Amino acid sequence: RESGIQEGLCLVNAMHITSSVFINDNEKGLWQDYINWLERLAPHEPIGQYLHNRTGEANGDAHLKRQIMGREVVIAVTGGKLDFGPWEQIFYGEFDGQRPKKVLIKIIGE
């Protein structure tokens, strides 16, 4: 509403390599399913399994989890409102937590 855009696109971007923005349903079981699924795909331990961790950081898994979940989402703006389907919401996924991070929001349209 603050942008005044009636028709266009809204970009929401996680501005860090170990965080993600995605769209899904806000349901507790689904959240736990995501946590379990991501941990199976890219387990945090053993730390030594990731070559990236040889740099002194222990977040190789966080980089992979971000890649799986994605960097950004784009939502249509229709009639001045974000055009979501039923149950859709925007979520921020934090996979490391070692430093402050930003989210970029850009609204483009008329």
PLM feature spans:
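Active-site histidine-anchored catalytic micro-motif
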Residues: 1-110
